[in-house]
Amino acid sequence: MEYMSTGSDEKEEIDLLINHLNVSEVLDIMENLYASEEPAVYEPSLMTMCPDSNQNKEHSESLLRSGQEVPWLSSVRYGTVEDLLAFANHISNTTKHFYRCRPQESGILLNMVISPQNGRYQIDSDVLLVPWKLTYRSIGSGFVPRGAFGKVYLAQDMKTKKRMACKLIPVDQFKPSDVEIQACFRHENIAELYGAVLWGDTVHLFMEAGEGGSVLEKLESCGPMREFEIIWVTKHVLKGLDFLHSKKVIHHDIKPSNIVFMSTKAVLVDFGLSVQMTEDVYLPKDLRGTEIYMSPEVILCRGHSTKADIYSLGATLIHMQTGTPPWVKRYPRSAYPSYLYIIHKQAPPLEDIAGDCSPGMRELIEAALERNPNHRPKAADLLKHEALNPPREDQPRCQSLDSALFDRKRLLSRKELELPENIADSSCTGSTEESEVLRRQRSLYIDLGALAGYFNIVRGPPTLEYG
């Protein structure tokens, strides 16, 4: 995530206000406010045209000049996956300049949780868009969060009341791959794509929202995760990867910010770098992924397979158990702006595995980080690993985050007088006065308490890392 300074006093005041708003209350207020007002008009940003000689571009532009309707661009409607992919290919093959001439929004919807009205789906009248509340970081009011590929908003359909994540991508940066994988492959551990709508020169992707934030947000706010929490997350991630890999899909960007908490599961997000292999080995034309989690074979760019995701998961496990990505402690970012050479020469980062890691979990991480991809286990094999299937007596009583929250609420009710007054706040502050032992003893029960409305630690879906 990047932060861009605006230097505007007015913007500072707005950001400061947003940081203290309750998103649920804002949505309720705005819903009542706009009920009797005229729909707001969406103003597309003015962007310069990028000339292109692509034949599809020329065809679309000639139709626009002649005043004829272009397929997929006449309205917002329900459709099939094939319709959505055709829509995505069409808008990615037409220069953004011509979308400024469109009289209204257009798009394809896959799920009826989004309810267009007479072929229209307008901001503020049909759907509300609210910036994510920044719940974890105190970054100062002079900064605006900005993701690498687009901004993400909390969206609520005014008719169905469904709350969603809405990712905004400038049309000149939009690629069909941004929707292909989520549209074509449905699984409980993959964030569901509800549809895509083009407003002006910005594509809006509506998808399933995670109530509990991302793994990265939890790590940055509350420190390292306990091993049973890691087991819970890892099993859900591996189920998603097992499904993707069975379809020969490489995610290419497994990392904490792309794993998002739901109340009863964890899901994978951000498939913009994903590819579906046609052969046993994928030969890349570019470097894909986040380098700190990249496998050695990905860095070499000589071909890799779905096993690259397994290595990235191993690096992610180190991050979850230590609170720090691999390599960073031994090679500070200030001295090493790139880790590609280090990974190429020294991988795997076994020295970064937590000192208090159990033997079983250490064995699993070492297997996932095997340098030779041919010796690296598949997702299905790791799901059977004993580290992820401890004896019943060693497992926590909770089988989901919701049941965990209920158990924790009862415990806190009984021992309320014994708890420090600032326990909820301290779990988010990351105070240096606390010992590492106490930080690791905290569990997802408290950290994700807001899922059931018990605490105010995590509020709503993930921020800009959601993808």
Swiss-Prot record:
Hydrolase listed as a keyword: no
Binding positions for ATP per the UniProt entry: V144, P145, R146, G147, A148, F149, G150, K151, V152, K167
Gene Ontology terms describing biological process: cardiac ventricle development; gap junction-mediated intercellular transport; immune system process; MAPK cascade; positive regulation of inflammatory response
Primary subcellular site in the record, as a coarse category: cytoplasm
Origin: domain of life: Eukaryota
Residue intervals passing through the bilayer: none
Active-site residues per Swiss-Prot or TrEMBL entry: D253 (proton acceptor)
Localisation: Cytoplasm
InterPro entries (alphabetical): Kinase-like_dom_sf, MAP_kinase_kinase_kinase, MAPKKK8, Prot_kinase_dom, Ser/Thr_kinase_AS
Domain Protein kinase intervals: 146-388
Kinase recorded as keyword: yes
EC number in record: 2.7.11.25
One annotated Gene Ontology cellular component of this protein: cytosol
PTM comment text: Autophosphorylated.
UniProt xrefs under Pfam families: Pkinase (PF00069)
PROSITE patterns with a match to the protein in the record: PROTEIN_KINASE_DOM, PROTEIN_KINASE_ST
Reaction equations catalysed: L-seryl-[protein] + ATP = O-phospho-L-seryl-[protein] + ADP + H(+); L-threonyl-[protein] + ATP = O-phospho-L-threonyl-[protein] + ADP + H(+)
Entry keyword set: ATP-binding, Cell cycle, Cytoplasm, Immunity, Kinase, Magnesium, Metal-binding, Nucleotide-binding, Phosphoprotein, Proto-oncogene, Serine/threonine-protein kinase, Transferase
Residues with the Phosphothreonine modification: T80, T290
Modified residues (Phosphoserine): S138, S141, S400, S443
Cofactor(s) demanded: Mg(2+)
Family membership noted in the UniProt record: Belongs to the protein kinase superfamily. STE Ser/Thr protein kinase family. MAP kinase kinase kinase subfamily.
Stated role: Required for lipopolysaccharide (LPS)-induced, TLR4-mediated activation of the MAPK/ERK pathway in macrophages, thus being critical for production of the pro-inflammatory cytokine TNF-alpha (TNF) during immune responses. Involved in the regulation of T-helper cell differentiation and IFNG expression in T-cells. Involved in mediating host resistance to bacterial infection through negative regulation of type I interferon (IFN) production. Transduces CD40 and TNFRSF1A signals that activate ERK in B-cells and macrophages, and thus may play a role in the regulation of immunoglobulin production.
PANTHER family documented for this protein: MAP KINASE KINASE KINASE SSK2-RELATED-RELATED (PTHR48016), MITOGEN-ACTIVATED PROTEIN KINASE KINASE KINASE 8 (PTHR48016:SF31)
Subunit structure: Forms a ternary complex with NFKB1/p105 and TNIP2. Interacts with NFKB1; the interaction increases the stability of MAP3K8 but inhibits its MEK phosphorylation activity, whereas loss of interaction following LPS stimulation leads to its degradation. Interacts with CD40 and TRAF6; the interaction is required for ERK activation. Interacts with KSR2; the interaction inhibits ERK and NF-kappa-B activation.
Protein name in the entry: Mitogen-activated protein kinase kinase kinase 8
Biological source species: Rattus norvegicus
Protein's gene: Map3k8
